[in-house]
């Protein structure tokens, strides 16, 4: 998730590297009386990531397994689709997670909205941890940012993405979707 400070443009990029062979697809849901229009990608009626008509973006990534939080659990439905259907801001997405008593113990989620607000949500050590956007970028891969020692860290992809974004920003070149996308795609 990247916000160009000179133009205010927001870019949400994903480089999917899921290690299982799944029959992934893109699902487009039109607006209805009570639900926002949305596009998500995933498989088996499971939204891995997507965006809605109000500019709320989300993505999820597998992380090292954590203990479950008492009274909370993993979703029993298509959580990503539900959030995109009902939330238009990061705060509203967080409210849905809390209302539904969701605490993922094998992954984390990133939410970003059209205002430039973004957060990574992790559930570590029996608590929900929020890592808010700092400056203008928020990146996650497959390690827990709030507990890197849990596994999958150091992560060359994360380091490469941060390095490439910093290089792009200091180059003086125009920042656009292609260039931001390549900071992820080349990692």
Predicted stretch roles:
Residues 94, 106-109:
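Surface-exposed patches in mature extracellular/periplasmic domains of secreted proteins
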Residues 81-90, 94-100:
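Acidic, contiguous internal or C-terminal segments within carbohydrate-active enzymes
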Residues 2-85, 107, 113-187:
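C-terminal, well-structured catalytic/ligand-binding subdomain of enzymes
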């Amino acid at each position: 998730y990247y916000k160009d400070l000179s133009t205010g443009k927001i870019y949400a990029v994903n480089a999917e590297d899921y290690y299982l062979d799944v029959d992934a697809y893109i699902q487009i849901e039109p607006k209805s009386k009570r639900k926002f229009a949305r596009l998500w990608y995933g498989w088996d009626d499971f939204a891995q990531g997507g965006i809605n008509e109000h500019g709320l973006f989300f993505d999820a990534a597998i992380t090292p397994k954590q203990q479950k939080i008492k009274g909370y659990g993993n979703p029993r439905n298509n959580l990503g689709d539900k959030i995109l259907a009902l939330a238009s801001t990061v705060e509203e997405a967080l409210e849905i997670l809390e209302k539904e008593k969701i605490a993922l113990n094998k992954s984390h989620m990133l939410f970003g909205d059209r205002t430039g607000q973004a957060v990574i949500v992790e559930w570590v050590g029996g608590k929900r941890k929020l890592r808010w956007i700092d400056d203008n970028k928020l990146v996650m891969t497959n390690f827990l940012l709030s507990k890197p020692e849990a596994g999958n860290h150091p992560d060359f992809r994360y380091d490469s993405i941060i390095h490439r974004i910093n290089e792009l920003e200091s180059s003086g070149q125009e920042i656009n979707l292609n260039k931001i996308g390549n900071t992820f795609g080349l990692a």
